[in-house]
Amino acid sequence: MMASLRKLGGLLALMAPALAALAQTPLATYEGADRMERIVAAAKKEGTLTLYTTIAEKDLPTLIKPFEDKYGIKVKVWRAGTDKVLQRALAEAAANRNEVDAVHFGSPEMEALAREKVLQPVTSPVYKLLQPGSVPPHHQWAATLLSVWVQAYNTKVVKKEDLPKTYQDLLDPKWKGKLGIEAKNQDWFQSVVEIVGGGDKGLKFFSDLVAKNGISPRTGHTLLTNMVVSGEVPLALTVYNYMPEQAKKKGAPIDWFALEPAVARSNAIGVARKAPHPAAALLFHEFMLTDAQTLMVSLDYVPTNTSVPSPLKGVRIMLTDPIRSLDEAEKWSKLFDDTVIKKAGR
């Protein structure tokens, strides 16, 4: 009996440092069985969090209110375009003005924040449920949704049976003067260059397309979607899947299809390294990857959590690499402008 107690005592002595270390582990990387209990308790004490995001204004209540109702934690939202969110987060970090708790916008921009040490690493069990490529090795952000570029058409101008089946079909003369594109979609352009042959062959595809059929560039996906609805742009090459779907549900003469593989970029959630309300930010991070995933589907977004059915189930998707997008942004922006935008008469 005494020998057994001595063995138990020795075992506990060996375990003590590990247990102590676990108890002192920051919540963001804590992996104990009571992880969520700790996060929720600490978050409720903080009572609030500030979110910087690019999520559409009309979609925010659908995503934010359920979180507030479930946990009794108020979310203060500052919403702006991608560039403004990035600039504000970087400027405040540089000035050591720590106001933001969580950030949600494009993954390439999230990677830029990570490189400037604005975000903190997070370890979460939900990561294993996310689509491949959703979490970078440094764990400083996690993709929540995919913005999938699809093709939208005016149903009064274009017949469904006439739609192109492949990217190469866009070279058919029947599309002359009917194509539109968003003027800043170099990520889509980069991916399709690879899809249709890569390198000079891929670039030649776009040069031929512009020369033969022309492409009308428009700034803003919402504007491009509206121009499809009006019939001014019969076929748009790059709108996000949820935009024509939402317009269609309201009775607009628009529908969409996907040339495969469809190209997608991800939006992601990150927790600020110096968040004033770190636990609340972490809880919101978990919420966006779990409960909010079905809410995103209700808004026609494509979720990254593979346990949630996708509105684009069955469509082959090619996910852009956010790190490559960031590192090669200047190169592909120039190629896109030189090959498509400038030659399109912009």
Predicted regions and their residues:
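Bacterial N-terminal signal peptides that target proteins for export
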Residues: 1-13
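Immediate post-signal peptide segment of exported/extracytoplasmic ligand-binding proteins
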Residues: 23-50, 68-69, 171-177
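Extracytoplasmic ligand-binding site segments that recognize negatively charged/polar headgroups
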Residues: 50-65, 76-93, 97-232
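A ligand-binding cleft/hinge motif common to bilobed small-molecule-binding domains
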Residues: 108-112, 234-253
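Short beta-strand->loop
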Residues: 119-128, 139-143, 235, 248, ...
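A bilobed periplasmic-binding-protein/Venus flytrap-type ligand-binding module shared by bacterial periplasmic
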Residues: 150-157, 193-195, 265-280, 296
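Periplasmic-binding protein-like
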Residues: 175-185, 287-308
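Extracellular/periplasmic bilobal clamshell ligand-binding domains
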Residues: 310-346
